[in-house]
């Protein structure tokens, strides 16, 4: 009699290529796969890995955040590299002169960067200018700012938990009784 070996956990889920069928993304992957193999630079390995990522793991980054990162001492004239989208931020009054490389830059963000005398590069241009990632600053948007992430963590109702409950309605009767009023068992 044989034994039933559970193969439930055998498959290691790692992206070796992007899920997207975008041909331009595929060409970038070819370029950076070559650079990652031949240059030995860690920068190229990271960019390649991020090109494979899902949209959730390539969150957008605002122009304000890019500016904040580039204002740190010693980062003048370096190229900001974002494997994702850069969006405009209306709260940012003055846009400094930036050199930026991103997969996509929204129309308004692009206009503001160029108006400030900045430069926007594509990843194939970056591969020519900085094949080993020299003179670049790699950055990414906040991954846990999605609304869905607020529901992750210790169960709502557990002490010191700030996890958002999944509630069908925000009325008086929903998640506002037990533990919150004396008439319903206890008030904490």
Swiss-Prot record:
Signal peptide: none
Biased composition (Basic residues): 161-171, 178-188
MF annotations from Gene Ontology: RNA binding; structural constituent of ribosome
Gene Ontology annotations for the cellular component aspect, listed alphabetically: cytosolic large ribosomal subunit
Subcellular localization(s) per the UniProt record: Cytoplasm
Keywords: Cytoplasm, Ribonucleoprotein, Ribosomal protein
GO biological process: translation
Chief location of this protein within or outside the cell: cytoplasm
Stretches for region Disordered: 152-188
Family: Belongs to the eukaryotic ribosomal protein eL18 family.
Name listed for the protein in its UniProt record: Large ribosomal subunit protein eL18
Species, as recorded: Ixodes scapularis (Black-legged tick)
């Amino acid at each position: 009699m044989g034994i039933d070996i559970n193969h439930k956990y055998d498959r290691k889920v790692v992206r070796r290529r992007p899920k997207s069928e975008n041909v331009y993304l595929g060409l970038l992957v070819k370029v950076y796969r070559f650079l990652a193999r031949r240059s030995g630079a860690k920068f190229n390995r990271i960019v390649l890995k991020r090109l494979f990522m899902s949209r959730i793991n390539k969150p957008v980054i605002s122009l304000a955040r890019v500016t904040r990162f580039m204002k740190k001492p010693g980062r003048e004239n370096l190229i900001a590299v974002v494997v994702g989208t850069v969006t405009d931020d209306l709260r940012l009054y003055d846009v400094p002169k930036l050199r930026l490389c991103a997969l996509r830059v929204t129309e308004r963000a692009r206009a503001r960067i160029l108006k400030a005398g900045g430069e926007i590069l594509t990843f194939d241009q970056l591969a020519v200018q900085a094949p080993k990632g020299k003179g670049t600053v790699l950055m990414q948007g906040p991954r846990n700012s999605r609304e869905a992430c607020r529901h992750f963590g210790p169960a709502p109702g557990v002490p010191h938990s700030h996890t958002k409950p999944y509630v069908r309605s925000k009325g008086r009767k929903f998640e506002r009784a037990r533990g919150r009023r004396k008439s319903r068992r206890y008030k904490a």
